[in-house]
């Protein structure tokens, strides 16, 4: 419609003005129009508070964060904050902050979930919410996002067959930042992922530990070279729903815990709940990816001592091994695992 075209022109003009001011604008839209509009800029100046001043340092300011009402309460808000935190991580600046009035309770709850804390009120009466890379709260994977706890207990592999992997992680081969835009701004495929498996042995990792996502190639020859690590996550929940044929929770409880984060539909989940001997649910927060040309294959893992004779999902990886694999995947480890 003419109205929509005019609206899009206004948005483009706004982007142009923001760019001229040295800002970055991030946008998500769908068939109904604008879904989210986020604007960030770099600063190095004091922040005046009622009763004090925050000294100048290198900061990213979220100057605008608007999410359409139809998306509030959905995963878009979580994804939008995640995307901004990735941008902040890449910038290398000390802090990121945003201002919000107390009545913006939904936004504030999301900020606090991701580790922002209120430093005080500015002179306009807005709360100033800050996150610093020098004071990361590692008590919770959301609060520490996108930084991994340097003192994690152990890591390991999550083995996912290629078909399911490409549904859960459809962006693992995309170039540049298109991946993070796609994952953060897709309501149905947000930052949190759920794996439903039939494992019964104790896992080598726990909640709060990082894991490496291994895409198992299942068709044709060359599995040693085509099966590979594509991404890394941090575990947020481990739920044993069924053990040795014994149901440990009702199917309705299982559905409630999984929500809309599984690649399986309700009927497929019911089949697994009924017929699998064991049922294990691993919920994880997506922290990063290696990207096209950087995926680490089984051959390299084996030649470097990170594979073995046991089932791969049970192989424990210490901090040195985990960092080595990230480095092979062309990840700047010093900007992902920080003290």
Language-model region placement:
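Short coil-to-beta-strand transition motifs
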Residues: 221-234
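Short, structured beta-strand/loop micro-motifs enriched in basic residues and often containing a Trp
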Residues: 186-197
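Conserved acetyl-CoA-binding loop-helix of GNAT-fold acetyltransferases
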Residues: 67, 73-87
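Short coil-to-beta transition motif at edge beta-strands of beta-rich domains
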Residues: 201-220
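Single conserved hydrophobic/aromatic residue that forms the stacking wall/gate
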Residues: 1-11
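Conserved acyl-donor/pantetheine-binding loop and adjacent beta-alpha core of acyl/acetyltransferases
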Residues: 31-64
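Contiguous surface segments at macromolecular interaction interfaces
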Residues: 87, 94, 98, 106-187, ...
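Cytosolic beta-strand hydrophobic patch enriched in CBS
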Residues: 24-30, 96
